[in-house]
């Protein structure tokens, strides 16, 4: 939503929609209802959004959201409004307690916190909070051909500029090829410390 309401301040995404859908499927979710978010949608009141999406759109019977969930114009809707409107429409609404990180003053696990750990290069915390290894998918592009001169295969990846990336540094990683083969890799993000240029 921030890409529409405040594009200059929109945070980078952790996972692209295509990959999210794959993860949903891997975890047994059979149906996903994608809502196109645009300027008109951003100005929709919470009650109108509820009627259009939950009632008329998908004919929901149960709605589960995080206890801090907000929606509608200027985030006017919350779990209490959902429960109120849901009661009128015969929809049961549950607010799910936030998952807390017991190691960091019981702070809630959120995409904002994960992005902060990424910026600090704290990949163990990123992976722990995601519940999976952080990953990128990119197209191999031409580089300077250094790999052949050092006897170690290298690949330069073009990464989507909308994706959040870790702090500059060298990371231990896994690389998966199109054929499904998985190999160990060293990933350098940022400058090339080995070469003067």
Regions found by a protein language model. Name each.
Residues 18-24, 50, 128-132, 139-142, ...:
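Short low-complexity stretches enriched in small and charged residues
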Residues 143-197:
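Phosphate/ribose-recognition catalytic cores of enzymes acting on nucleotide-derived substrates
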Residues 1-8, 111, 176, 188-191:
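Short intrinsically disordered, low-complexity coil segments enriched in acidic
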Residues 4-5, 140, 157:
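Short clusters of hydrophobic/aromatic residues that line enzyme substrate/ligand-binding pockets
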Residues 42-153:
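Classical nucleotidyltransferase
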Residues 1-58:
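Core alpha/beta nucleotide-donor-binding catalytic domains of modification enzymes
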Residues 36, 67, 97, 189-191:
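Short secondary-structure boundary segments
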């Amino acid at each position: 939503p921030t890409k529409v309401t405040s594009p200059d301040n929109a945070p980078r995404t952790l996972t692209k929609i295509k990959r999210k859908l794959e993860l949903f499927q891997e975890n047994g979710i059979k149906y996903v209802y994608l809502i196109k978010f645009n300027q008109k949608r951003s100005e929709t009141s919470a009650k109108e959004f509820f009627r259009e999406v939950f009632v008329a759109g998908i004919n929901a019977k149960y709605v589960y959201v995080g206890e801090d969930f907000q929606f509608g114009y200027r985030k006017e809707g919350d779990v209490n409004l959902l429960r109120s409107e849901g009661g009128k429409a015969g929809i049961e609404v549950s607010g799910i307690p936030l998952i807390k990180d017991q190691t960091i003053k019981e702070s809630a696990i959120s995409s904002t916190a994960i992005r902060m750990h990424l910026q600090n290069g704290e990949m163990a915390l990123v992976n722990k909070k995601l519940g999976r290894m952080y990953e990128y998918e990119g197209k191999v592009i031409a580089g300077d051909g250094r790999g052949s001169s050092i006897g170690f295969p290298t690949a330069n990846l073009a990464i989507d500029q909308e994706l959040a990336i870790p702090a500059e540094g060298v990371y231990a990683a896994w690389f998966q090829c199109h054929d499904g083969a998985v190999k160990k890799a060293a990933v350098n993000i940022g400058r090339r410390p080995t070469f003067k240029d």
